[in-house]
Regions:
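Catalytic cores of secreted or luminal carbohydrate-active enzymes
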Residues: 383-417
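Non-transmembrane alpha-helical segments in soluble domains
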Residues: 13-21, 84, 157-161, 192-196, ...
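A residue-level signal for conserved active-site and pocket-lining positions in enzyme catalytic cores
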Residues: 29, 281, 395
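Short hydrophobic/aromatic beta-strand or adjacent loop that forms the aromatic wall/cage
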Residues: 435-439
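Conserved alpha/beta catalytic core and glycan-binding cleft of carbohydrate-active enzymes
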Residues: 165, 178-182, 186-353, 357, ...
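Glycine- and acidic
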Residues: 2, 66, 139-142, 175-176, ...
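Substrate-binding/active-site clefts of carbohydrate-active enzymes
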Residues: 1-166, 173-200, 216, 263
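Extended hydrophobic/aromatic segments used for targeting, binding, or gating
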Residues: 43-60, 361-393
Length: 468
């Protein structure tokens, strides 16, 4: 990585010039709350496997001590604050991935070190027999809509906003936050409403992963109060299928590219509520998406049974690493296609760190336990794949330049709709189930400046037309 302190808050701070040059305006950090990386420690194939991702929280009000660069006590708070301050100085917001759906105390056989010992029945959802509901897939489920737990979550988020100045939160398995004490989904969950209306949180971003491991899927229907954005899982799934050439997905792809109006086109929520993504920490990297047809999680020690099977990927003709120049060229073309579509879609784009230089996890789509070369960013690929990096940088700048894509300009002076879908012929928007071709045009008027050659100054408007 070329930094003095890799794997720490200081290491990220050292990479701020890189992020700024790329054009990044916000970073979403995977869990930074204190967690025990030795939970589930195993030895598999000569590797020590740990909790690398940090989704099993131990302390909700403290940064993880393992992310400090120096060994002094209590340095983690100072170093994290310094990182956030410097990111802000460079125009980059900070979003924290927070986990309030479960804790590290596990199921009935798990340890007792916090909420189990304070009041097990208040803090956790329990069956009538006293067992733990497991809507999180991690052994227990926090009883989020109990008044006591609501207050803890509110105080925790206020703490990170007031003392650390974070700009927002992404809520892991957020649908759990809308369940009643018996697991029933609530129409108007008090916790979600309180978060949306809290005066301390009024200016921060609230982003939901709008599903959970219990089968509740709320993309487009998450209780929002005009405040909540969502990771758009339908964008990921349907665009992946369309981009690799599958039938049946062109009409859905058109909706996703144009801001998912079927999901976010209501009176209050708009397309900015859609966090558009093709990759994240869960699943394949973008390079692996076009290098593997199947997951390869053998190194995790579960006989390749863990991780998602529905990846909607395509290996471009060969599984895994290839020395064939034609296959590698096709993979890079597919990556460019994906990048261009993502950054020319209405909504808020998000991509996984390292996608901009073809980082690989060697087909592992669930690298939660791999604190090694499988998960680490291979910065040597940056120079090797400079072409892809420059394409990402260009597309980010292109998106910033063209406000028509973002829907942040005046109506087109030529009478074009702000966004239109086309098939083989202009203005033919009859996208059929057999379609594999799709065109989208964004149109609007930009203020170009003042005409100094006339007697009175007037603003000139120029057309901003973008064809995808």
């Amino acid at each position: 990585s070329g930094v003095q302190f890799p794997g720490t808050f200081e290491g990220i701070r050292e990479k701020i010039p890189y992020l700024k040059a790329l054009g990044i305006t916000a970073v979403e950090l995977m869990p930074v709350f204190e967690f025990d990386e030795t939970m589930g420690k195993r030895e598999i194939g000569g590797r020590t496997l740990l909790d690398y991702w940090g989704y099993n929280t131990v302390g909700f009000f403290a940064p993880n001590t393992g992310y400090t660069a120096r060994q002094e006590y209590n340095r983690e708070g100072t170093e994290f604050k310094n990182l956030i301050r410097e990111l802000h100085q460079n125009g980059i917001e900070v979003i924290l991935d927070v986990v309030f759906n479960h804790t590290a105390e596990g199921n009935e056989q798990g340890p007792f070190f916090e909420f189990k010992g304070i009041d097990n029945r208040i803090y956790y959802m329990l069956t009538p027999e006293g067992n733990y509901y497991n809507f999180s897939g991690c052994g227990n489920t926090l009883n989020c809509n109990h008044l006591v737990v609501q207050q803890m979550i509110l105080e925790c988020l206020r703490h990170w906003v007031i003392h650390y100045r974070v700009d927002g939160f992404r809520f892991d398995l957020a649908s759990i936050l809308g369940r009643n004490e018996d697991g029933t989904p609530l129409l108007q969950p008090p916790l979600l409403r309180n978060l949306a209306e809290d005066p301390v949180l009024k200016d921060v971003n609230l982003i939901a992963e709008a599903w959970d491991a219990g089968g509740l899927y709320q993309v487009g229907n998450f209780p929002a109060w005009n405040r909540w954005a969502e990771w758009n899982g339908k964008y990921r799934d349907e665009l992946r299928s369309f981009l690799k050439g599958e039938y049946w997905f062109a009409a859905q792809a058109a909706k996703r590219i144009t801001g998912s109006p079927d999901l976010y086109g209501g009176q209050y929520r708009g397309y900015n509520s859609s966090i558009n993504f093709l990759t994240c920490h869960d699943g394949f990297t973008l390079y692996d998406l076009y290098s593997y047809n199947e997951k390869h999680n053998e190194e995790n020690g579960w006989n390749n049974t863990d991780g998602a099977d529905d990846n909607r990927s395509w290996n471009c003709g060969y599984e895994g690493k290839s020395d064939n120049p034609g296959i590698e060229a096709l993979r890079k073309r597919m990556i460019k296609n994906a990048c261009a579509v993502l950054l020319c879609s209405r909504g808020t784009p998000m991509f996984l760190a390292g996608d901009e230089f073809c980082n690989t996890q060697f087909g592992n789509n669930n690298a939660y336990c791999q604190d090694n070369e499988i998960s680490w960013l291979d910065w040597s690929l940056l120079e090797k794949n400079r072409e892809i990096y420059e394409f990402f940088r260009y597309m980010i700048a292109f998106r910033k330049k063209h406000s028509a894509i973002r829907g942040e300009c005046s109506p087109s002076g030529l009478g074009f709709p702000t966004v239109s879908v086309h098939t083989n012929q202009p203005w033919d928007n009859n996208v059929t189930q057999e379609s594999k071709f799709l065109g989208v045009m964004f149109a609007g008027a930009l203020t170009a400046g003042s005409n100094q050659e006339t007697e009175r100054t007037r603003e000139l408007e120029t057309e901003d037309l973008v064809y995808l």
